[in-house]
Amino acid sequence: MTKNKQKGLIYATTTAFLWGILPIALIGVLVTIDPFTTTFFRFLIAAVILTPALICKGKLKHRKKYFEKKIILQFSIAGVLLCINYALYIFGLNKTSAEAAQVMMQVAPVCLLLAGVFLFKERFSKTQWLGLIIFISGLIMFFSPRYEDVFTELNTYGSGLMILLAAALTWVFYAIFQKTLLKDFSAQETMVVFYWIGVLFFFPLSTFESLVNLTTFQWLLVIFCGLNTLVAYGSFSEALTHIEASRVSAILATTPLITLVFVQISPVTVLIPEPLTLTVILGAFFVVTGSIITSSAKN
């Protein structure tokens, strides 16, 4: 294995690990402060650290392009979509569980592939269709103990899943817009703009009075969530420069399993784990396996 591939695998694994434990930290914060304020700090910490880092390293090479009308419009649409994605995700997480949130978010890359088929006439192989069937079967198995919550009563948990599904679909549209921006900018050049858009978007929606109620441990969780946002996306971008996107997707598909494990050993006491029946565990594995097959199979 070449050094580039080794680096790529390390970056991708880092991203999967950070995204796997992120919802656990968020739940620890959400018991005290609201979703908007939590998300504001995620964007603020990432923006404040990344901006001077890029300036000092001279990596903002296309600053003049930022002010072109077409580019401003593209950044605005993509940035708002990302903000909506973050908001929907954290509201859905607040109504469900860490494991459910990460399983539902696996819908996003699968939907992105399907968007390529229907919007851009890309090919979808028989193996990929098989992966999609396994993926959907996994979703049904994972949420089978919650059947009444989701399909009959549509209570807090069921509505949370619908919100998470909306978050996943919003991410698909964001990814399509970001893909057009990556023709003119590096991933870091786009993310620093998105972070500041997030700061401006969530600032007026935030309520800072509740911050005085945060414990020292919760403040550490807030800082961790901001650093997680920055490092995870940075690692994700670096992984894509070293190994194929399909390999990165395959590694990131393991995120729900990481969450499933760490929920059981987390020091965050307010967590309510999903019932770990054999069907639920197999469902999680099917979701991961189906996602890997769908993203990695040759077109």
Predicted regions located by residue number:
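Transmembrane alpha-helical segments that form core, pore/gating elements
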Residues: 12, 24-27, 50, 112-114, ...
